[in-house]
Amino acid sequence: MDKPVVRISVRNLVEFILRSGDLDNRGGSSDREAMQKGSRLHRKIQGRMGSHYRAEVSLKYKTEYEDVGIQVEGRADGIFTEDGQYWIDEIKGVYADVSQLEKPVEVHRAQAMCYAWICAQEQKLEKIGVQMTYGNLDTEELKFFREEYTLEELGLWYQNLLDRYHKWIAYQFAWKKERNVSMSDLEFPFEYREGQRKIVSGVYHTISTERQIFVQAPTGVGKTMSTIFPAVRAVGAGLGENIFYLTAKTITRTVAEEAFSILKEHGLKFKVITITAKEKLCFCDKTECNPENCLWARGHLDRVNDAVFELWTTQDSYDRDTLLEYAKKWQVCPFEMCLDLAVWVDAVICDYNYVFDPNVYLKRFFGEGTSGEYIFLIDEAHNLVDRGREMYSAYVDRADVLEAKKLAVDYSKGLVRALEKVNRQLRTLEKECTEYEILPNPGAVSLGMLQVMGEMDKLLEELHGKELPEQLLEFYFCVRDFLNIDELLDENYVVYTEMGEGGKVILRLFCVNPAANIHRCLEKGKSAVFFSATLLPMDYYRTLLSTRKDDYGIYVTSPFRQENRCILTGRDVSSRYTRRGYEEYHRIASYIARTVWTRKGNYMVFFPSYKFMEDVLEVYENEFSAEWVRCISQTSGMNEREKEEFLEEFSASEGTLVGFCVMGGIFSEGIDLMGEKLIGAIIIGTGLPQIGTEREILRQYYDKKGVNGFDYAYRYPGMNKVLQSAGRVIRTQEDTGIILLLDERFAGKDYRNLFPAEWSDRGNCTLNTVEEQLGSFWKRIREKN
């Protein structure tokens, strides 16, 4: 049997094995201008070298080990001969003053040495020279460093380098063999519920055909295990290599961890990491990743490979506590260690942004020119529409430009000039803007921002680790975001200006349809599974999350008995803006009171906004309060501890508890209150988003596309919030409960068509009949039990 061959680029090899020093986020990034200047400088230097100089020479060399072959490949910037001797030329463009460089950077020299070894092997040379050429990107001043090596010296050095890499590859292949054996007899860990087998077979078929699938399956079906299990089996069958379980909220990451743990209890060998937000993994009070402010950043790169290798080879599950434990032991940054470890594991559980966000995505997996046999499982996929729009949109505020200019005076005249240029360009747009103004493109602002980025990168490199004011650094990231999104502009974008709160213009690059950008990311892998309890209507989500025409779709009905819950629509009440006032608030408060009086227990009432909630709560407490009913309410900006305390009330309550909450908020999805913890959800209104510039732009955009713009901008997003809120009730086969939809609009055809199939038994009620109807339902439940 042929040995497997692992291919790795020269650059990736040396940057991985030979990295050293500190973590420091104070330097600039490789922006477009620097890359363009670097390419021009390369070509200029190569063009000057004459006919004896060969530019961009492809080289590769395969080393055979007992278990695997490792092929190292890349392109040398130049190979030339001088006085009969071969020389490898490695060119690096920098903003720094090259005259101050005392020696080449170690990884740069190592790259050249790899090329020298391969070239010497090919040409059968006894010795070869290495030339490091450093060029300033602005002045084009050059500095050269030269060294000569014998074939023997290079051979010993190269073999040592490769042996250090081989230990990683050897363990990886041994682990995969063990992993795949563990999957051969792996069975679904539970008795299949209704609908689960349909999801499992649909997901497996999707992965095997390298397609995408949308799975609409209500709460209680067991979507998490029904998607993870077939994905794991597909990896075992060689249909994929890594699973990415993507979520929008922390709670769903925990559910995914539990699913993998259950499969491991049934014999699965699988390495699973959860990527936690940097702020939650940081040992410091403030995430300042530089050696001056963080002990863990100091010398991080000297130790991180040993830390990752030990953690990878001794553990199979990597949650926050495990990562912190090992980071402390090795004195490294836990977040960066986590990202490095992710490359070597079988499954990554993480937030959407680590795959989709152009500023945050995992470059180790999804960088330019990289791809893999990835299986994407996208949980709560309905959230990806708004998250996608957010990730793929950007803006520049003239107020921020002026503030940055003020701060830049002490640092760089070039930056001040570039910022003033952008300020003038934005001021021109400001004169033409009243409420908002749609533009064909960002115009000259794009070029101006590119120049600002170049000046800021230059400044960051020249500072040599000295800190910029935090506000100026934040503006730097804003500029980077703007330029990243500027590159993506197409027919899925609307460029517009609007006036900011401070009276200065804001130029926005608004992604109205994120499907094409999401598709570009998913193309880096093999297949994708979008699943949620609320992917209705499915065509809407397909349009906004995928550009493919061959996606599969599955609709799974609820496995729960309809007789265990009662759904009623209140037809004599409205949440319309035009109807809001004491009379309507009193009617809604009366509905709430009559509902909770019919049976002791815990209820949640969901409102379209905090203001609406507070107005109704005030009326309720003034006119309908009772000793046996306790009310609690959600507040804006609750932290994790406050959220947990709120939810604990539902476990501890013995009387009747009414939680006043906001639709689309932290309590309307992703929480499990089973059994008696929650027996009713009262939903006030249709969840329509507030009218605003972005929503109106969406409506107009989709109207022009020939579809109902109101549906796409308002009705569908609103109905999703309603369905999510309703999904808090009935979480298991044994649960009983009621769902009350309070708004006359729910009785209309436009909304009835959006109800899930299992709501077919929905009834209507009025304020006069609701107590009797709910009373009959609870009586029937008591008699049955």
List where the protein language model places each region.
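A substrate-engagement module of RecA-like helicase motors
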Residues: L186-E187, L239-V348, F356, R424-L439, ...
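Conserved RecA-like P-loop NTPase helicase motor core
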Residues: R571-E583, T635-F746
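Walker A/P-loop
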Residues: S208-P230
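A contiguous, basic/glycine-rich beta-loop/short-helix subdomain that forms a polymer-engagement track
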Residues: L323-V348, N359-F366, K458-S574, R579, ...
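Mg2+/Mn2+-dependent nuclease catalytic core
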Residues: Y61-G155
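Metal-dependent nuclease catalytic cores that hydrolyze phosphodiester bonds in DNA/RNA
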Residues: M1-G84
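Signature of the SF2 helicase/ATPase Hel1-core->accessory helical subdomain module
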Residues: T227, T254, K328-A347, D351-M456, ...
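Conserved pre-motif I regulatory segment
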Residues: A174-Q216
